[in-house]
């Protein structure tokens, strides 16, 4: 029974704590490489500045567990269930999290490029300032997750569920977002230059201030999406459903909108130089209410 026990600067390399009662147990600056704690519930435990390389947390229930500045390279968390847990600036190089169920868990400032996350489910998980370039998240489920300020260039989200996810300020250059469901997702100020977003659902998604240069949204649905002030020069929106979409102030130079469906689609003050259209029926070239608000704003300055 290690409930509420505190270990400080202890040598615990290779320790076997399987089946131990680990509730509100604290480990400070301990050497714990190759720890074995498989299939054991951890509740409210804190690992602070510990060496945990090669440790085995396979099948563990991790309730409100904090890993703060820990070395977790080559560790095993397969089939674990982290809930309300935190991985803070703890290297996870070649660590394994296959088949995990993450709920309300935070990854802060971690390079996840070599971390195995295949077959895992993510609900309301926060990835803050993490390097995830080139990650393969094809057909993974992300619900209400935060990818704020993440590096996701070249990541593959093909067929993924991204409902209500937040990619504000993230870099998604050349990322694969084909056949995704990104309903009500947030892409404010994100960089999707050259991203592939074909055949996807972006209903009520918000792209305000995003970079969409050369991105391909062909055959996608952007019902009620907000694309104000986006840089979509050279982007492809062929055969898209742009019903009630708002391109106010957008840069659409050289964009391809042939075959797109328009219905009360706002193009107020959008730069459409050399953009290609099959027809313009359903486009609102000038929004009187927005124009009046702009005039009022200028008078107030």
Set out the residue ranges of the language-model regions:
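Tandem repeat scaffolds
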Residues: 1-301
């Amino acid at each position: 029974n290690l409930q509420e026990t505190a270990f400080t600067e202890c040598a615990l390399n290779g320790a076997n704590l399987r089946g131990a009662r680990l509730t509100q147990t604290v480990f400070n600056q301990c050497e714990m490489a190759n720890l074995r704690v498989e299939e054991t519930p951890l509740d409210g435990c804190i690992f602070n500045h510990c060496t945990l390389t090669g440790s085995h947390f396979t099948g563990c229930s991790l309730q409100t567990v904090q890993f703060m500045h820990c070395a977790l390279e080559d560790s095993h968390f397969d089939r674990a269930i982290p809930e309300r847990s935190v991985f803070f600036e703890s290297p996870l190089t070649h660590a394994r999290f296959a088949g995990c169920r993450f709920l309300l868990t935070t990854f802060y400032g971690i390079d996840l490029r070599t971390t195995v996350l295949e077959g895992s489910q993510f609900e309301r998980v926060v990835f803050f300032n993490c390097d995830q370039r080139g990650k393969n998240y094809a057909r993974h489920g992300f619900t209400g997750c935060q990818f704020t300020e993440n590096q996701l260039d070249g990541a593959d989200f093909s067929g993924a569920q991204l409902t209500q996810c937040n990619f504000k300020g993230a870099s998604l250059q050349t990322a694969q977002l084909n056949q995704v469901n990104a309903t009500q997702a947030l892409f404010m100020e994100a960089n999707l230059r050259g991203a592939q977003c074909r055949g996807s659902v972006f209903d009520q998604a918000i792209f305000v201030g995003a970079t969409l240069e050369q991105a391909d949204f062909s055959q996608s649905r952007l019902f009620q999406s907000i694309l104000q002030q986006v840089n979509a020069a050279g982007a492809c929106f062929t055969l898209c459903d742009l019903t009630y979409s708002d391109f106010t102030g957008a840069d659409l130079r050289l964009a391809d909108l042939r075959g797109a469906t328009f219905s009360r689609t706002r193009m107020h003050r959008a730069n459409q130089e050399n953009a290609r259209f099959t027809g313009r029926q359903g486009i609102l070239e000038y929004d009187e209410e927005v124009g009046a608000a702009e005039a009022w704003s200028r008078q107030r300055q």
